[in-house]
Every structure is written in C-alpha cells, then in structure tokens.
Amino acid sequence: PAYMALSHAKALAQRAADGKPDHFHYVQMPLNLAMTEGLTSSTQEVGGKMYPAVRAATLLGLRVMASGAIRQAKLGTLPSHVNKALGEDLTSDAQRALQFTRSAPGVGTALVGLKQPTHVSEALALCTQAPMAPSAVLGMFGKPKT
C-alpha cells in the first residue's frame, strides 16, 4: 500500500512496550487544501472497519500533527466557494489554508514554516478567529471515499 498502516504501527508499539503503556502518541501526516486524503480517503483499517487516516489515528489514541498546512506557499488561487466555506472575513489564501488545517477534526497541531515577519503576523492574526466547526470542514468534501 501507498500508506503506513497506523493500526499495525500501534500494535508494534504495544508489543515493544511488553504489557506497559506504549509511547506511541503522535503521528505526523500531510493535510492541506490540496492534500485532503487524511480526511477524505478511507485507507486505514481499525477494528475491521475502514477510516480516513485522521479518524483512524483518533480511534487508536494518537494525536495528529498536520504538516504542509499551507502547502509550502504553493496555494494558487482558491476558488470562491472554498473562500466562502473557510471564512470570507479571512484576509488571505494562506490564512484560509491554515484555517482549514487547524480546524480539521482530529488534528491537534497544524505545522507551518514561516520566514517573513509579515507572514508570521498574518498567521498569528488567525488566532483571533474561532476554528471552523468540524461539520463545516467535513461538509466541504462530502462522504469519505473508500
């Protein structure tokens, strides 16, 4: 498969812990407006059912750190319906992209690298906005694909 089986990794961590609590608590995966598979593609088996990676991680007790939150600044221009869904009061596509990733249900941290002080200020301004409701994020895509 083209993905890591999270349940297998968790089972290996539990086996290595030899009956004690394992130390596998976090997983990092790409998640952004261009790479939504972590929310939309059911690639992970947990308990005999298929789930998207972020949901599977949550079911396995893992915290998700989403990398590439603003897609290394290669956003392009977001379509108007995406802008509307993410919040028309946000001032840039970078803020909208970060809003999407930080609001994704099951994501604990959205990782982003910023070089310019103005970009840092722009990202920090997002802290004055509430994250999107989980249903609003998931509603952007419809039902997860299997």
Language model feature labels by segment:
Residues 1-146:
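Beta/alpha (TIM)-barrel catalytic core signal, keyed to glycine-rich beta->alpha loops juxtaposed to Asp/Glu
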